[in-house]
Amino acid sequence: EYELKDVKFKKNSRIKIDPFTVPNEEKVKYIQELYDGAKDVSKEIVQIITMLVCTKQYVEIYNTLGKAVKDTRFNSRIMIQVVASNGKDMQTMFDSYGRTKGLEMMEKINLTKFGRKTAKTAVKILHADEMIGQELPVVIENGFGGVILHEACVHSLEATSVAKGLSVFTNKIGEKIASDVVTAIDD
């Protein structure tokens, strides 16, 4: 039988504004401001998705010495994805700002400028010169190859992007899209 003693410690995730006490209407204003910053950048902006995600995590850790540590952790993140298209080509730009804090993090960011910058980048990469393909040696550390594949290819293969016609892989079922030496299985 153990006698548990709570351990006091310095909490690193103290917050000033609990996101779960802020009315939804105020949270919507944050994502609307982000959206408004992006929407008028160019007529080539065809889609803007903004999100605000706030989490509250209760953590309890116990050990065999009878010590118990309890904490509540908050994470807040605001995100924007902008799709630019010229009718032939399409480019997507994603960016986010987040902290292990409450909604006081919004005091540190100009959401209009953040949205505008993301939209400008989407348009800029839409008009960027094509990369010149070339063969280069690649060495991938064991275990990390999946992450590289995911970031390079799998985001474009996600069903929602393909179904909405936002992916370079749209309408490619049955077509060869990679080298014969590449095998990728999504299970």
Regions found by a protein language model. Give the residues of each.
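Active-site bordering "gate/hinge" segments
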Residues: E1-D187
